[in-house]
Amino acid sequence: MRLHLAGIIPIANMKTDHENPLPEVPVDNGFSAIQKSVYECAMAGCSTIWIVANDDLIPLVRKTVGEWAYDPVYYARNYSKFYKEHRKEVPIYYVPIHPKDRDRRDSYGWSVIHGIHSAWRTSYRLSQWIVPQKYYISFPMGLFDVGQVREYRKEIKDKEKNFFFTHENKTVKDDLPLSFTMTGEDFKLCRRHINKKTSKEYLPPLP
């Protein structure tokens, strides 16, 4: 069965050095931070992309990135006669933070956990056969050459091993906003860890 890699882009509770509350900081000409993350997830081979944001920001973010993206790997295969027919669309879903969690579960890490749980829960309600087996987390403010993501696409989608981008031998574990992958079991462990740092006792059911 084909791996369902779900891309998670946390925006809620994101802290930046800029006054702009949206991840619209330009990283290139006509290319914003949120667009970078969407492109990165598509390049990594994600089957779906889930953007976690507060209700008031979702309409603005949706206007910027839309409802779907193309998988860049399949977008322009010029060696194929009918390459346009083989283009793959990656649906984008928007996940609001529950009002009860605001100002209580207010860490950036919780936005990631909430996005993963929402992706699992929504998929499971449709069919257990489309539940994500792995998650790719992309931080809008984590800047690097996203073109190199394609080189590691196979490793990123490995069912058995997690993948971490590094900078000077440091990863997200060192509080750097660098992309990484995790499984459902990793999700459970991280959720318990983050829960210890928050005031709210309620936990959503385990996937």
Describe each PLM feature range.
Residues 79-198:
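Conserved beta-loop-beta/alpha segment of the NTase-like Rossmann-fold superfamily
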Residues 199-207:
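Catalytic core and acceptor-binding pocket of nucleotide-sugar-dependent glycosyltransferases
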